[in-house]
């Protein structure tokens, strides 16, 4: 048994190292793509915007009318978003099917119907969203309407899941657990699309890395130092493993964030009109800045206050994300224990199913997406679906 555990631990360590190497490779690729390929979906030129300015020659009446995505790239970005939406919609169907099939195996038609509903809701919600983003105007009013619609979709799905499962013979607790798990998977899929397309691929990769780091550190240190069980539903998990998992993740992810988005001051960019008057424009967001994209921390202050704010906010959010990753792992482990299964499916062979691989990530992505939704409705400066862009043109 010890030999098997040691072998498994080595495999997990190898996977973790490989993921870090791949992440660094992607960062290098991103740097070259942003520097030399204007067609890159995450390049500076691809995200450039046209700023429309209205001025009567008086500083008091000078204002920015609007800032729109460059028209040459709207169709390409919409097509890119469409591909991501369709792919994640398929993932949503598979995740829901694995979850429902584990809880009520003998109801294939019900499983298929609920799974397809999840995929339809994902694609039906996000395709119109990207159409508005790239071919219409995403303003504060649209932002509120979208947020209300998103909340309505969650309530609708919860009601459908609860009502549908009430007609079959399962325990009420399993009924609630399934509905909760299915809604979380739905939010995670919407969040994955959002982070991948709107915030850049590095952000979704970083969120998945948080889940992988937490799981890996918790397992390795738990096997070595674990003595006190964390919770009865998962005897193999210990408090020591959870502590080192969270601590190791906070250190690792914060280092990655620092290396890839060095905390320099970002001044409010200004543009001068014909009368040489400086006009304040919106914050100049970096397409791949992990701190602003994931944690929504804007570098607009200086001195010691800036560094304290940066470190406290970043570390607190990474810590919270790691806790949610552990919660996701425990939640889906609890479902497997209740249903007496080892894996949700054999879709990925020895690695189990999609839910087995992304159980922790689904919780933390859902957390960060809800965090972004709340930030989007509470701040007038950063709308939820406003892409991170550079402002490079004036008309």
Curated annotation (Swiss-Prot):
Pathway: Phospholipid metabolism; CDP-diacylglycerol biosynthesis; CDP-diacylglycerol from sn-glycerol 3-phosphate: step 3/3. It catalyses: a 1,2-diacyl-sn-glycero-3-phosphate + CTP + H(+) = a CDP-1,2-diacyl-sn-glycerol + diphosphate. InterPro entries: PC_trans, PC_Trfase_euk. Its EC number is 2.7.7.41. This is Putative phosphatidate cytidylyltransferase. GO terms for molecular function: phosphatidate cytidylyltransferase activity. It is a multi-pass membrane protein. The lineage of its organism: Bacteria, Bacillati, Mycoplasmatota, Mycoplasmoidales, Mycoplasmoidaceae. Belongs to the CDS family. Keywords: Cell membrane, Lipid biosynthesis, Lipid metabolism, Membrane, Nucleotidyltransferase, Phospholipid biosynthesis, Phospholipid metabolism, Transferase, Transmembrane, Transmembrane helix. It is found in: Cell membrane. One of its GO terms (cellular component) is plasma membrane. GO terms for biological process: CDP-diacylglycerol biosynthetic process. The chain crosses the membrane at residues 13-33, 78-98, 115-135, 144-164, 177-197, 201-221, 242-262, 306-326, 358-378.
């Amino acid at each position: 048994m010890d030999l098997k555990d040691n072998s498994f631990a080595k495999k997990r360590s190898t996977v973790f190292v490989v993921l870090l190497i791949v992440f660094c490779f992607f960062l290098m690729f991103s740097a070259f793509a942003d520097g030399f390929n204007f067609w890159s979906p995450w390049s500076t030129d691809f995200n450039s915007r046209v700023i429309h300015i209205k001025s009567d020659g008086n500083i008091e009446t000078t204002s920015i009318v609007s800032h729109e995505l460059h028209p040459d790239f709207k169709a390409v970005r919409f097509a890119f978003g469409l591909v991501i939406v369709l792919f994640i919609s398929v993932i949503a169907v598979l995740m829901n099917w694995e979850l429902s099939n584990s809880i009520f195996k003998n109801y294939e038609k019900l499983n298929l119907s609920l799974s397809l509903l999840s995929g339809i809701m994902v694609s039906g919600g996000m395709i119109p969203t990207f159409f508005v983003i790239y071919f219409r105007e995403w303003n504060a009013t649209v932002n509120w309407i979208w947020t209300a619609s998103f909340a309505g979709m969650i309530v609708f799905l919860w009601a459908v899941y609860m009502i549908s499962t009430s007609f079959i013979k399962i325990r009420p607790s399993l009924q609630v657990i399934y509905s909760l798990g299915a809604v979380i998977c739905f939010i995670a899929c919407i969040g994955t699309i959002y982070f991948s397309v709107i915030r850049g691929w590095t952000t979704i990769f970083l969120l998945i890395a948080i889940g992988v780091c937490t799981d890996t550190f918790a397992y390795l240190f738990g096997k070595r130092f674990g003595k006190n069980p964390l919770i009865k539903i998962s005897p193999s998990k210990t408090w020591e493993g959870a502590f080192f998992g969270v601590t190791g993740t906070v250190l690792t992810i914060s280092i990655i964030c620092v290396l890839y988005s060095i905390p320099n001051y970002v001044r409010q960019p200004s543009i001068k009109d014909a009368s040489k008057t400086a006009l304040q424009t919106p914050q100049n967001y970096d397409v791949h800045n992990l701190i602003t994209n994931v944690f929504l921390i804007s570098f607009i202050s200086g001195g010691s206050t800036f560094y304290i704010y940066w470190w406290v906010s970043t570390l607190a959010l990474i810590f919270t994300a790691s806790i949610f990753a552990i919660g996701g792992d425990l939640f889906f482990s609890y479902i497997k224990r209740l249903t007496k299964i080892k894996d949700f499916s054999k879709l990925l062979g020895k690695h189990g199913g999609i839910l087995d691989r992304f159980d922790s990530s689904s919780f933390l992505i859902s957390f960060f997406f809800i965090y972004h939704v709340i930030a989007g409705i509470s701040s007038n400066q950063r709308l939820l679906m406003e892409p991170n862009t550079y402002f490079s043109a004036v008309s």
